[in-house]
Amino acid sequence: MVATAASSAFFPLPSADTSSRPGKLGNKPSSLSPLKPKSTPNGGLQVKANASAPPKINGSPVGLKSGGLKTQEDAHSAPPPRTFINQLPDWSMLLAAITTVFLAAEKQWMMLDWKPKRPDMLVDPFGLGSIVQDGLVFRQNFSIRSYEIGADRTASIETVMNHLQETALNHVKIAGLSNDGFGRTPEMYKRDLIWVVAKMQVMVNRYPTWGDTVEVNTWVAKSGKNGMRRDWLISDCNTGEILTRASSVWVMMNQKTRRLSKIPDEVRNEIEPHFVDSPPVIEDDDRKLPKLDEKTADSIRKGLTPRWNDLDVNQHVNNVKYIGWILESTPPEVLETQELCSLTLEYRRECGRESVLESLTAMDPSGGGYGSQFQHLLRLEDGGEIVKGRTEWRPKNGVINGVVPTGESSPGDYS
């Protein structure tokens, strides 16, 4: 019916009683040409017809007198000659038809049920990733861009860390737990609570190169009474080779007071259904990080300040930025000849916009093998500790120093 109404605005339909031969006065004339007017018989008296056709409503002529002669009233009420302009469609009818079409389409759209039927069918329509493994694992692919590689044509450690952070946030979003778009559940939002990372461990088996496509799988699990663990596996999309393993521990902080908080029961009820009962993909490195200061450090870089773009929506420096600052004090000869293969960071406090920091690095004498190990400290000028860390390095194009944990600790087969 909508299509008929729309088409009738462009092409008026003929009346059912239309005839091709000349008929009595009131029937549709056989020709509308104003160049050849015809006369109409009426009781033996012939009167030349006006060039204009009788007015019509719904295809039937109306408003004519029973006699063939026109009265003075008829002469004044006769319509103007039919021209190209006055034979255009009725735009009000056309507008009404278009409006009807759009309203019908909108109604059909709203009636569709877009809710996923199964947890493993949760898919982001914008291509940000998908939920797999019975709704417990989030998967997303990334292509390595030219601006994400370093001098050796491989992805930087910052690129890897950005992929970890992006998938963590998208996981919360696609699972329907994000209230403000940045990792907070509705109950967390009500209580001004945010997630902050307490510890991060990363093991890199191989860095992808420009043009490679990597697949990132991530999931969450319980960590103690008031913590949450998030694990990642990064693999090569073409070969399935595991490139990177990462594990982290997160705790809650009140956004207004900037103090750590216990997980409220309401928040726990939101997140626990998404927990995976699985050990971490990396064995926890519980070695105590030694104290580092000016006397014990081999290299110190001072005067580091955050830029505006280094802040996240929680108004503190993004945790990925800390890695770049830590590497600022790493010896240049190490950066040129070796690559980072293992990273452990312990976050002590947040860093704000006005902070001025110092980066301290010392060689770890306990490190063995053919690579290097370093202790790191990122602190404020007044001595307050921001991040403590340990890094392990291997010769470039070499293999990782030590055994990479097998996939037995992952929650399932992700193929």
Swiss-Prot record:
Enzyme Commission number(s) from the entry: 3.1.2.-
GO terms assigned for molecular function: acyl carrier activity; fatty acyl-[ACP] hydrolase activity
Transit peptide stretch: 1-60
Reaction equations catalysed: hexadecanoyl-[ACP] + H2O = hexadecanoate + holo-[ACP] + H(+)
GO CC term (a single one): chloroplast
Region (Disordered): 1-81
CDD domains named in the record: 4HBT
Catalytic center residues: 314, 316, 351
SUPFAM superfamilies: Thioesterase/thiol ester dehydrase-isomerase
Compositional bias annotation for Low complexity: 1-16, 24-41
Keywords: Chloroplast, Fatty acid biosynthesis, Fatty acid metabolism, Hydrolase, Lipid biosynthesis, Lipid metabolism, Plastid, Transit peptide
Protein's cellular compartments: Plastid, Chloroplast
Function statement: Plays an essential role in chain termination during de novo fatty acid synthesis. High thioesterase activity for palmitoyl-ACP versus other acyl-ACPs.
Family from the record: Belongs to the acyl-ACP thioesterase family.
Record's protein name: Palmitoyl-acyl carrier protein thioesterase, chloroplastic
Gene for this chain: FATB1
